[in-house]
C-alpha cells in the first residue's frame, strides 16, 4: 500500500511542479489586479501541496515524527512570510516572495532526504536571515543616497575580499573561505553585493572615458583576487556582472564585444598558466578517463541524472549518496535523480522567472543607479544558476558554484535573501516612481485641458 501511495505521489509532485512553473509565467499576463492576486494565491496552494506530498513520502519511508514536525515548521514559516511581508510592504512583489518560498522549499525537501541535520540547519539560517533582512526594503525605499558612496563600496568590497589572504582556508582546492573565531563563511558571496553597488554607483555618474577606465581597473582587481584564490566560478561571475552593467550603462556594443574578447584571451592564458584550470578543463573534456580520480564528481553527476531519466526514481529511491558534494555544488544532480529531469527543467524555469522579475523592475526604474542595481543582481542570480547547472551537466567545466536558495550553504542563503530584499525595495521604488509620473502626467493633461477651455471661452 505504501509503495502505491509513494508511486502516485511521485507523479503528483511532478504535476504540482509543472503547474507552479506555468503559473510563474501566466502571472505576468493579467492586467486585472484581482485576477493576478487569484493566480498568486493559487501558487501558494500548489507550493504547499508539493511540500505536503514530499514530506508525506519521506515520513512513510522513515516513520519519524521529526519529519512531520519539520514540515509543520516550514508551513508556519512560509505562511508568516507570505502573509506578513505583503502587509508590511504593500507594494512588494508577491511573485518574487512566492518564488523565494518555493525555491527554499525545494532545497529543504532534498536536504531532508540527504541529511536531516543539514536541512534543519539550513532552515534555521533561512528563518533567521528572513527576519534580519526584512528591514532592507524599507531602507532601500527611504534612503536616497545609496549612489553617493561608489568609491567607499569599491574599497570596502576589495578589503573584505582580500581577507582570504589572512584568514583563508582551503576548501575543495580553493582558498575562498575564511575562518574567524570558528565562524566559517565565503567573503565573495557578500562582496558580490557590494561589487554591484560599487559598479552601479560609479557607472551611473561616469561622464568621460577615463572614468570608465578607472572603474574597469578596480573591477579587474576584484577578478584578479578571485583568480589568485582559485575561485574560478567567482571570477567568471564578477566578470560577467561587470561586463553586462558596463554595456547597459554605456549602450556601446563595442565594450561588450571587447570585454568578451578580453575575457576569452584571459581564459586561454589562465589555461596555460594555472594547473588547477588545466585540470578542470581536462575533467570537462573527458571525465570518464579520470573516473577513479578527479573525474568522479562529474561522472557520478551524469550517472545520477541519467538514472533519474524524465520522471525520476522517486523521492527516497535514488542513490544520491554516490554523488560527491551532493548537498551544495551537485544538488541539481540529486534533484534530477529523485524527481526526474522534467522536474529539473521546471526548476530552471522557476529560476528564470525570478530573473525576469528582476529585469522587469530594472526596465521600470527611472533612475540609472536603480536600473543598474536590478540588472547587476539579475545577471548575478541567473549566471550563478548557469554556472552551477552547466557544471553538473558537463555543459561547462565545473566551477563549484551553488544554486541560489536551493543548495546547502549559509553564506549563499543569506546573501541571496539580502539580494531579494534589495530587489523588493527597488520594486517599491519603481512603483512609487510610476505613480508619481502618472500623477504629473495627469496634472499636465488637466492644465492643458484648462488652457484649451480658456482659449475657447475667450
Please annotate each region the language model reported.
Residues 1-17:
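Hydrophobic transmembrane alpha-helical segments in integral membrane proteins
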Residues 18-25, 82-83:
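Alpha-helical transmembrane segments
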Residues 22-40:
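Membrane-interface helix-loop junction between the first two transmembrane segments
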Residues 64-293, 333-391, 418, 422, ...:
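Hydrophobic alpha-helical transmembrane segments of multi-pass inner membrane proteins, especially
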Residues 305-342, 365:
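Long extracytoplasmic/lumenal interhelical loops at the membrane interface
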Residues 394-439:
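Transmembrane alpha-helices of multi-pass inner-membrane enzymes
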Amino acid at each position: 500500500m505504501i509503495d502505491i501511495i509513494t508511486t502516485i505521489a511521485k507523479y503528483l509532485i511532478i504535476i504540482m511542479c509543472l503547474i507552479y512553473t506555468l503559473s510563474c509565467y501566466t502571472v505576468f499576463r493579467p492586467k486585472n489586479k484581482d485576477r493576478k492576486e487569484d493566480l498568486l494565491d493559487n501558487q501558494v496552494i500548489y507550493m504547499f501541496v508539493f511540500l505536503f506530498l514530499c514530506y508525506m513520502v519521506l515520513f512513510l519511508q522513515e516513520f519519524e515524527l521529526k519529519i512531520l514536525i519539520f514540515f509543520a515548521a516550514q508551513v508556519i514559516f512560509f505562511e508568516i512570510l507570505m502573509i506578513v511581508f505583503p502587509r508590511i510592504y504593500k507594494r512588494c512583489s508577491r511573485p518574487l516572495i512566492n518564488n523565494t518560498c518555493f525555491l527554499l522549499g525545494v532545497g529543504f525537501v532534498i536536504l531532508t532526504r540527504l541529511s536531516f541535520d543539514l536541512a534543519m540547519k539550513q532552515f534555521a539560517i533561512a528563518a533567521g536571515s528572513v527576519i534580519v533582512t526584512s528591514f532592507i526594503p524599507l531602507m532601500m525605499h527611504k534612503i536616497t543616497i545609496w549612489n553617493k558612496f561608489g568609491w567607499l563600496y569599491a574599497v570596502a568590497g576589495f578589503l573584505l575580499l582580500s581577507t582570504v589572504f589572512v584568514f583563508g582556508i582551503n576548501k575543495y582546492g580553493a582558498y575562498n573561505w575564511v575562518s574567524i573565531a570558528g565562524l566559517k563563511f565565503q567573503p565573495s558571496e557578500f562582496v558580490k553585493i557590494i561589487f554591484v553597488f560599487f559598479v552601479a554607483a560609479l557607472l551611473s555618474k561616469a561622464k568621460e572615458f577615463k572614468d570608465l577606465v578607472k572603474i574597469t581597473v578596480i573591477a579587474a582587481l576584484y577578478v584578479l583576487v578571485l583568480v589568485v584564490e582559485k575561485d574560478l566560478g567567482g571570477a567568471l561571475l564578477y566578470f560577467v556582472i561587470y561586463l553586462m552593467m558596463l554595456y547597459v550603462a554605456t549602450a556601446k556594443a563595442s565594450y561588450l564585444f571587447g570585454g568578451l574578447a578580453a575575457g576569452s584571451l584571459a581564459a586561454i592564458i589562465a589555461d596555460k598558466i594555472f594547473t588547477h584550470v588545466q585540470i578542470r578543463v581536462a575533467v570537462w573534456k573527458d571525465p570518464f578517463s579520470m573516473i577513479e580520480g578527479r573525474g568522479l564528481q562529474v561522472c557520478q553527476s551524469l550517472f545520477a541524472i541519467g538514472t533519474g531519466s524524465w520522471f525520476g526514481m522517486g523521492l527516497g529511491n535514488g542513490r544520491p549518496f554516490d554523488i560527491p558534494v551532493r548537498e551544495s555544488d551537485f544538488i541539481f544532480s540529486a534533484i534530477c535523480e529523485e524527481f526526474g529531469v522534467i522536474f529539473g527543467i521546471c526548476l530552471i524555469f522557476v529560476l528564470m522567472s525570478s530573473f525576469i522579475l528582476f529585469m522587469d523592475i530594472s526596465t521600470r526604474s527611472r533612475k540609472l543607479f536603480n536600473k543598474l542595481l536590478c540588472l547587476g543582481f539579475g545577471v548575478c542570480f541567473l549566471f550563478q544558476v548557469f554556472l552551477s547547472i552547466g557544471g553538473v551537466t558537463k555543459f561547462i567545466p565545473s566551477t563549484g558554484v551553488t544554486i541560489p536558495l536551493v543548495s546547502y550553504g549559509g553564506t549563499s542563503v543569506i546573501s541571496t535573501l539580502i539580494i531579494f530584499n534589495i530587489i523588493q525595495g527597488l520594486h517599491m521604488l519603481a512603483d512609487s516612481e510610476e505613480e508619481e509620473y502618472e500623477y504629473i502626467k495627469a496634472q499636465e493633461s488637466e492644465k492643458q485641458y484648462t488652457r484649451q477651455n480658456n482659449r475657447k471661452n475667450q
